[in-house]
Amino acid sequence: MRKLLVLFLSFVTAIAVAQGIDANTAAKAITAAGLKEHLSIIASAEMQGRETGTEGERKAAAYLTSQYKKFKLKPGNNGSYSLPFTLYQDKVVSSTLKVNGEPYALDKDYWVNASSAPQKSLKTNAIIFVGNDFNDKSTVDVKGKLLVATESKERSIYKIMAAQKLGALGMIIIANNNPSYPSNLTGRLSLKPSAASNFVSMTVSKSLGSRLLGGSKDFSDQELADVPKAVYTTTIDWTAERSNGEVLSADVMAVLPSKEKTDEYMFVTSHYDHEGIKNGVIYYGADDDGSGTASVVAIAQAFAEASKKGFSPKRNIVFMNVSGEEKGLLGSQYYSEHPVYPLEKTSVDLNIDMVGRIDPTYKGDSMNYVYVIGEDKLSSDLQPITDKVNKNYNMELDRRFNDPKDPNRFYYRSDHYNFAAKGVPVIFYFNGTHADYHKPTDTVEKINFDLMEKRVRIIFETAWEMAMKEEMLKRDLPLNMPGR
């Protein structure tokens, strides 16, 4: 009788504890101090900027794994917290470039994606300047010609793709002096060895661009905009030598298992890689995307603590920090092509990429905001849930970047996209860009942790709603993925 009484009281206590857990209470485990503790490690000098495939990134992965083990979350990949993959790197070992007989230096005056370098050499005596609005509707005869274009808000890859489609020999992009070009363009990584291409392309400095277009001095932005679209007599002599290599990287995965819908999943994601070290300077990546990575860890911790008090999700919650985002969303692409869990049984991906800062649009009293991107694309269930959760926080949920005509195309620029491309509903949480974006000055000291706490609590409560929903999210909106 005594044993039955003890069992009965234990059962009643368990029910009472479970009933006492709600999302808003559980979210209070996420604090500004806790976020700062995690981010101060993730974006520390010890992590060396966390470039994909480097020792610094491996240290960051080890830290993430240690936290998930500490929270007693299960390994996310068949008994392992690591989902390893191989990336292929084609490098330009050496290159020479002469324009009208004058030599120019690789990684100073021009930058080359190895797969777009000439097989051996390229010589031409004429170029066609097509400005900043070139597209595949152009009526200019570009077949077999080398084109020169200027950057615009639209990504340059679309101009390059248009040039290839119209049969051009290649395209030169005149840069807006973006300091991230060297690492982004030389030695680019990919999930497959790149095939040799007959189409060539390179990015050049504004100074070299001015010489290509006949300028004896560097053009100002306005002077460059006023250059006529025409054929220019310019002699180009370009050679290149390439090499191939492999880089090993890994996504980090942990899971809070469900006891109910054991074959259904939802994801909370971030990317933990950044830009590494350039010219001896560490690019810390505190906001991009140390903030998202610290957020995923804090959300995982809050769910783990709630589970100790009786919370049990209706479907499995997967916490994943991916690598290779800065190299082209490669870690999430690898997962989408080699999923550990069926994508058709994955209800949603909540992706967190840059949530610790304030962009120039918001300042002062108006900084109580977060950009919410992608919730209108695949499921009509998403926005009502987001709005319901926000009633506890009264934050400005800014949806301006959902506009398909927005030139920034942020929807295509973070890891949720690879889930969406497979039909999985997504929400991307984002604070917008700022002056320290992709610069070594993106440091922990500039993070607004009080605002970050509020943003992350909203994401946590949204994840809670997704985890406890009786049915998976409807996929009732058309899958329209024009490509990045």
Question: What does each of the following model-derived ranges do?
Answer:
Residues 1-23:
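Bacterial Sec-dependent N-terminal signal peptides
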Residues 18-76, 97, 257, 476:
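N-terminal hydrophobic or amphipathic helices/low-complexity stretches enriched
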Residues 20-23, 109-137, 194-285, 301, ...:
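Soluble metallo-hydrolase cores and metallopeptidase-like ectodomains found primarily
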Residues 48-143:
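Noncatalytic luminal/extracellular "stalk/propeptide" segments of secretory-pathway proteins
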Residues 105-106, 199-204, 209-217, 322-428:
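Metal-dependent peptidase/peptidase-like ectodomains
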Residues 105-200, 283, 301:
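Extracellular/luminal Protease-associated
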Residues 301, 434-484:
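His/Asp/Glu-rich mid-to-C-terminal helical/loop segments that flank catalytic regions of hydrolases
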Residues 301-328, 349-352:
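Short helix-loop-beta-strand segments that form the rim/entrance of peptidase-like active sites
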